[in-house]
From Swiss-Prot:
Keywords: Cell membrane, Membrane, Transmembrane, Transmembrane helix, Transport. Forms a stable energy-coupling factor (ECF) transporter complex composed of 2 membrane-embedded substrate-binding proteins (S component), 2 ATP-binding proteins (A component) and 2 transmembrane proteins (T component). May be able to interact with more than 1 S component at a time. One of its GO terms (cellular component) is plasma membrane. It is found in: Cell membrane. The keyword Hydrolase does not apply. One of its GO terms (molecular function) is transmembrane transporter activity. The chain crosses the membrane at residues 26-46, 73-93, 116-136, 151-171, 247-267. It comes from the Bacteria. It comes from Ruminiclostridium cellulolyticum (strain ATCC 35319 / DSM 5812 / JCM 6584 / H10) (Clostridium cellulolyticum). This is Energy-coupling factor transporter transmembrane protein EcfT.
């Protein structure tokens, strides 16, 4: 389960999506997320799924690797789906005592699952195809207008990127701790859900210690390289919008607008 969490990892590649300006990818990711919540019909979700599938294929990221990142949220999807199926009132399909399954509940559960899967894949594609440095530069550039009101834009962008980058690092450390404790007789697989959750408590203390140690090492390394924030800093690679970025943004906006018009005007 721990190794199945792939969001935050960068997958080296030479696809057009890897070469695209990181600002374009961030903007399109937010646009996609907004439209995921605006769509409320199955044919709309079908179109968004096809669009997402085309994006995944064009990124040259292995489909199995992308689907692997969905495994950690399966429990959340199933749990929330069961609650929706039994709690939402409507046309009863099946009932037993005080429990009843409704058509509306099933409908909401399916749509919620589709939304969560699309959101995770969309957010993951951003980190799969963008290096942490490029992501930091892009966030700082997009938030640049806030500098006029004395907002520490560079520091905010740096913290966001480091936090995102630490996800796979901490997950890898968690996996190592679990394996080390398992070799000493710890059991994380037997018992009910509550017992399994309790068995992970001994993992938390060494994990927190490791996290603080890694954070201290990172701070020391940054100071050793004379890092002093954004003042006077230059970039090895300057961000530039290309025709490809304009083309991709235009196609995405036109496609999403068409889907919304079909959703709210024609249907």
């Amino acid at each position: 389960m721990i190794r199945d969490i792939t969001i935050g990892q960068y997958v080296p590649g030479n696809s057009l999506l890897h070469k695209a300006d990181p600002r374009t990818k961030i903007i399109l990711t937010f646009i996609m997320m907004i439209f995921i919540f605006l769509i409320n019909t199955y044919w709309g979700y079908l179109l968004l799924t096809l669009f997402t599938a085309i994006t995944v294929v064009s990124s040259n990221i292995p489909v199995k690797f992308v689907l692997k990142g969905l495994k950690p949220i399966l429990f959340i999807v199933v749990f929330a789906g069961i609650i929706n199926i039994f709690m939402i009132k409507g046309t009863v399909i099946w009932s037993w005592g005080f429990l009843s399954i409704t058509y509306e509940g099933i409908n909401v559960a399916i749509k919620m699952a589709i939304r969560l899967f699309l959101l995770i894949i969309t957010a993951s594609l951003l980190t799969y195809t963008t290096t942490p440095i490029a992501l930091t530069d892009a966030i700082e550039n997009l938030l640049a207008p806030l500098k006029r009101i004395k907002v520490p834009v560079h520091e905010i962008a740096m913290m966001m990127t480091i936090a995102l980058r630490f996800i796979p690092t901490l997950l890898d450390e968690t996996d190592k701790i679990i394996k080390a404790q398992s070799s000493r007789g710890a059991d994380f697989d037997s018992g009910n859900m509550i017992e399994r959750a309790k068995s992970f408590i001994p993992v938390l203390i060494p994990l927190f210690i490791s996290a603080f140690r890694r954070a201290d090492e990172l701070a020391t390394a940054m100071e050793a390289r004379c890092y002093r924030g954004s003042e006077g800093r230059t970039r090895m690679k300057q961000l530039r919008f290309t025709r490809f970025d304009v083309l991709v943004t235009g196609i995405t906006v036109v496609f999403m607008t068409w889907v919304i018009l079909m959703e709210y005007v024609f249907f």
